[in-house]
């Protein structure tokens, strides 16, 4: 079924013909929701497959390859920093687990059966190694899938489209209406203030010597602050673009500066994208 739709003229000029740009914003949001649900369900091996799938999808996009490659490198760098942070946490866990294991095995020596002692030692070693690997890899995969899926949606969907999608949602638009612009700007200001205040508190307490932290915890704390700064700066930049799009939407509504174009409301490719994405996650879940 076809219909006429009022959209801004600048959005009409910025439309692209690549396959991922033609996917509706609602379907992209649905796929991102499936990705976030899979984070809490799938194992780290399946999450690796999802991360590689996201990278493969980004290389199939012909337009804006320089922008996509730049964001991919930024996300990989942030993922590496997350891996370093989780690796330091995993080392602390390993040291603690080894101490607990040595204490437990020393108590187990009292038993006369040596085979049971050997079995306990092997079982604990395997459990520590498996937990060490999961603690190191899973947070990095969580971070990469979450951030890069958002980036792909933001790159391949203009802020105007996201604003129109939000505007079509009666519940969201009824709650926020034009105040959504104020919420985005306020959230950006709050996040920036929190980052600056945390940084100042750490600097002052470190200079005064009142920050009593172990040396093994100081570096992970600084790495986490660096990751949060890079992550929130990206969020702030994207929220400003969405806020500008909201301002443009309100201005276009007041000036009636819209272009009437003939668009298709829904077609077979949209349904096919939903079916393929759902089957992809079902197959991974059952594998």
Curated annotation (Swiss-Prot):
<comment type="similarity">
    <text>Belongs to the ycf92 family.</text>
</comment>
<keyword id="KW-0472">Membrane</keyword>
<keyword id="KW-0934">Plastid</keyword>
<keyword id="KW-0150">Chloroplast</keyword>
<protein>
    <recommendedName>
        <fullName>Uncharacterized protein ycf92</fullName>
    </recommendedName>
</protein>
<keyword id="KW-1133">Transmembrane helix</keyword>
<dbReference type="GO" id="GO:0031969">
    <property type="term" value="C:chloroplast membrane"/>
</dbReference>
<feature type="transmembrane region" description="Helical">
    <location>
        <begin position="32"/>
        <end position="52"/>
    </location>
</feature>
<feature type="transmembrane region" description="Helical">
    <location>
        <begin position="175"/>
        <end position="195"/>
    </location>
</feature>
<feature type="transmembrane region" description="Helical">
    <location>
        <begin position="72"/>
        <end position="92"/>
    </location>
</feature>
<keyword id="KW-0812">Transmembrane</keyword>
<feature type="transmembrane region" description="Helical">
    <location>
        <begin position="133"/>
        <end position="153"/>
    </location>
</feature>
<feature type="transmembrane region" description="Helical">
    <location>
        <begin position="266"/>
        <end position="286"/>
    </location>
</feature>
<feature type="transmembrane region" description="Helical">
    <location>
        <begin position="216"/>
        <end position="236"/>
    </location>
</feature>
